């Protein structure tokens, strides 16, 4: 006969006692049905035992009991310290095992250490990390609405955080339902409560590196796209990207998780701001003139949270707040080697296609396509990078318009009452306004977000820099097409034609964009 050792965790019995029963060998059975089949013939024999045996009888006859593999803890040195705490000398080799408590341990000795420290009886379930047990959520109780082919779920504003299988924390279970409906995913619930932040270290020793002449450490990374999310909240192409960033910037970014970073977006309570309807039925939101910049999910900086509410009400959009503060400016370097270029009369010429795919440069100028931006850099010897695709959107520097009185007209429009005092300011669009108040009035009337570049007239603007080589009208211009849009609404075929017009206008013409008007 073989003794069967019962490590019990429940009941009023002594938790440190092992109860030994003479039974036939009980193999490890992973499936509930098999466990029930083995337990059944033993149940009748055990019913005649003493009272404490009934605990074992109950545990055996439950089909869902966790049968684990007992770890041989005698292999590891152990003892009790001077302070009375137990210790186990565990090796530092990483051989993850999953315990019967659902926790992953670095190796089998980790289970021994845990049991000794906590007086527990955890056993090994299987080798390797514990596999998360996903819980499918019943989304039928939540109202679903289909608009323009998109399914939206109406969720209650109840904060009961749950962790999704994508390692993202949702406000409640309905949040997972809403995300799945909106993005056509199948995310399930891992557990109640917020997701635990599991930070993984990256082994950078496997990537070759070199030190440049200026003392910078450069890491040679493979061109493999396997996105990882760093602890700084940025997504890197692969783990090596984190290594390269740390070496170059002297930082200590670790890997937060595999896959792209997902940003938790705080909700804005737009009900706190007063609204009114115009005669045309449009909803207007009255916002306080407080400058607390926030970044929207559309990549645009708003004066404050109310600005997002007003934008959504006016345009029927669903922009949310990405984060407090201005949107971060990110740039993308361009590969200009793919475009043909040569030099004529000392001027670099780039052959660009007649394709309108507007891009915004880091200099705040809109270019007709990537090639036009390359041509600009070649001609002027600059290093302008691509900020983003599409036309540039003006970000708002600090401009305090709250000191100017406003009034609301009968049609619902708000206007600013400005004095006739001439105190010119230069705006971020390169235009001179009669005063700061006039600039505020322009923003309110035109729904723009122009900022103040400086006090005084715009003297050293983009146009002056762009045409600095043209002291007089050039009699000959080349025929390449690199469109320039002037403030007069005219599209000029290239820099030469635009700058000639700039000189002829007594240098009052401004460059609006490097694209067709």
From Swiss-Prot:
Source superkingdom:
Eukaryota
Which residue numbers mark the site Reactive bond 5 for chymotrypsin?
A: 354-355
Site residues, Reactive bond 6 for chymotrypsin and elastase: 420-421
| Biotechnological applications | The galactomannan conjugate of this protein prepared through the Maillard reaction shows almost the same inhibitory activity toward trypsin, chymotrypsin and elastase, with stronger heat and emulsion stability, and better emulsifying properties than the untreated protein. The conjugate can therefore be useful for industrial application.
Which chain positions carry the site (Reactive bond 2 for trypsin)? 157-158
Which tissues does it occur in? Expressed in oviduct (at protein level). Expressed in egg white (at protein level). Expressed in egg yolk plasma of non-fertilized eggs (at protein level). Expressed in the magnum of the oviduct (at protein level). Expressed in oviduct. Expressed in liver. Expressed in the cortico-medullary border region of the bursa of Fabricius by the bursal secretory dendritic-like cells. Highly expressed in the magnum of the oviduct, and at a lower level in uterus. Weakly expressed in white isthmus and very weakly in infundibulum. Not expressed in duodenum and kidney.
Entry PTM: Glycosylated.
Is Disulfide bond among the key words of this record?
yes
Its cellular-component GO annotations read:
extracellular region; extracellular space; protein-containing complex
In chain numbering, where does the site feature Reactive bond 4 for trypsin fall? 289-290
State which residues carry a glycan (glycosylated).
Answer: 72, 186, 506
List the induction conditions: Expression is regulated by dietary stress. Significantly increased expression between days 0 to 5 in egg whites of eggs laid by corticosterone-fed hens (at protein level). Decreased expression at day 14 in the magnum of the oviduct in the corticosterone-fed laying hens. Significantly increased expression by estrogen. Rapidly up-regulated within 0.5 hour after extrogen exposure with a peak at 1-4 hours and diminishing thereafter. Up-regulated during sexual maturation of pullets.
Matches recorded under Gene3D superfamilies: 3.30.60.30
Which residues are connected by disulfide bridges in this protein?
73-112, 90-109, 98-130, 139-177, 155-174, 163-195, 204-243, 221-240, 229-261, 270-309, 287-306, 295-327, 336-374, 352-371, 360-392, 401-440, 418-437, 426-458, 467-499, 477-496, 485-517
Chain positions of site Reactive bond 3 for trypsin = 223-224
Q: Which UniProt keywords apply?
A: Allergen, Antimicrobial, Disulfide bond, Glycoprotein, Protease inhibitor, Repeat, Secreted, Serine protease inhibitor
Q: A single GO BP annotation from the record?
A: negative regulation of viral genome replication
Give a GO molecular function annotation for the protein: protease binding
Q: Where in the cell is it found?
A: Secreted
- Site positions (Reactive bond 7 for chymotrypsin and elastase) are 479-480
Entry's free-text remark on domains: Seems to have at least five separate non-overlapping active inhibitory domains; two for trypsin, two for chymotrypsin and one for elastase. They can be bound to the domains simultaneously.
- What is this protein's function? Serine protease inhibitor involved in antimicrobial egg defense preventing contamination of table eggs (non-fertilized eggs) and protecting the chick embryo (fertilized eggs). Inhibits trypsin, chymotrypsin, elastase, subtilisin and a proteinase of fungus Aspergillus oryzae. Inhibits calcium-activated potassium channels KCNMA1 (bovine) and slo (Drosophila). Has antibacterial activity against B.thuringiensis LMSA 3.06.004, but not against S.aureus CIP 103 811, P.aeruginosa PAO1, B.cereus ATCC6464 or B.subtilis ATCC 6633.
**Other facts noted in the record for this chain:** Prevents symptomatic gastoroenteritis in vivo in a mouse model of rotavirus infection. Significantly inhibits intestinal replication of EDIM strain of murine rotavirus in infant mice up to 4 days after intragastrical administration of the virus.
This protein is called Ovoinhibitor
Q: Which gene specifies this protein's sequence?
A: SPINK5
């Amino acid at each position: 006969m073989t003794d069967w050792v019962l490590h019990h965790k429940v009941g009023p019995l002594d938790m440190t006692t092992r109860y030994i029963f003479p039974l036939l060998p009980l193999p490890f059975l992973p499936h509930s049905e098999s466990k029930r089949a083995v337990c059944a013939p033993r149940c009748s024999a055990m019913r005649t035992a003493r009272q404490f045996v009934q605990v074992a009888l109950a545990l055996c006859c439950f089909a869902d009991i966790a049968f684990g593999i007992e770890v041989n803890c005698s292999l590891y040195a152990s003892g009790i310290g001077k302070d009375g705490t137990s210790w186990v000398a565990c090796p530092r080799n990483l051989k993850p095992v999953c315990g019967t408590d659902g926790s992953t341990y670095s190796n089998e000795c980790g289970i021994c250490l845990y049991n000794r420290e906590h007086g527990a009886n955890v056993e090994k379930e299987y080798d390797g990390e514990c596999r998360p047990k996903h819980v499918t959520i019943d989304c039928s109780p939540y109202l679903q609405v289909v608009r323009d082919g998109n399914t939206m779920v109406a969720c209650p504003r109840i904060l009961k955080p749950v962790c999704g299988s994508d390692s993202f924390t949702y406000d409640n279970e309905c949040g997972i339902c809403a995300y799945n409906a909106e993005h056509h995913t199948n995310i399930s619930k891992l557990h109640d409560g917020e997701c635990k932040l599991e930070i993984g270290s990256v082994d950078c020793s496997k990537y070759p590196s070199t030190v440049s002449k200026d003392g910078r450490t450069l890491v040679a990374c493979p061109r493999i796209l396997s996105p990882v999310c760093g602890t700084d909240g940025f997504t890197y192409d692969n783990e090596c990207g984190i290594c390269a960033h740390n070496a170059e910037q002297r930082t200590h970014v670790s890997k937060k998780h595999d896959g792209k970073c997902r940003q938790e977006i705080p909700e804005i309570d737009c009900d706190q701001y007063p609204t009114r309807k115009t005669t045309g039925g449009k909803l207007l939101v009255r916002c306080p003139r407080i400058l607390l910049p926030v970044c929207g999910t559309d990549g645009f900086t708003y004066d404050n949270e109310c600005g997002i509410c007003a934008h959504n009400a006016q345009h029927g959009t669903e922009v949310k707040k990405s984060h407090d503060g201005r949107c971060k400016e990110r740039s993308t370097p361009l590969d200009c080697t793919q475009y043909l270029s040569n030099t004529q009369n000392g001027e670099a010429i780039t052959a660009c296609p007649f394709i309108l795919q507007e891009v915004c440069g880091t200099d705040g100028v809109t270019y007709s396509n990537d090639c036009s931006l390359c041509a600009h850099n070649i001609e002027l010897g600059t290093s302008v990078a691509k900020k983003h695709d599409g036309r540039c959107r003006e970000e708002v520097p600090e401009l305090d318009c709250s000191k100017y009185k406003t009034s609301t007209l009968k049609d619902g429009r708000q206007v600013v009452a400005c004095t006739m005092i001439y105190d010119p300011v230069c705006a971020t669009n390169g235009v001179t306004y009669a005063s700061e108040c006039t600039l505020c009035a322009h923003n309110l009337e035109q729904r723009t977000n122009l900022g103040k570049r400086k006090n005084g007239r715009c003297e050293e603007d983009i146009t002056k820099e762009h045409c600095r080589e043209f002291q007089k009208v050039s009699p000959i211009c080349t025929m390449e097409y690199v469109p320039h849009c002037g403030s007069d609404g005219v599209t000029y075929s290239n820099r030469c034609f635009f700058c000639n017009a700039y000189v002829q206008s007594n240098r009052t013409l401004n460059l609006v964009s490097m694209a067709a008007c």
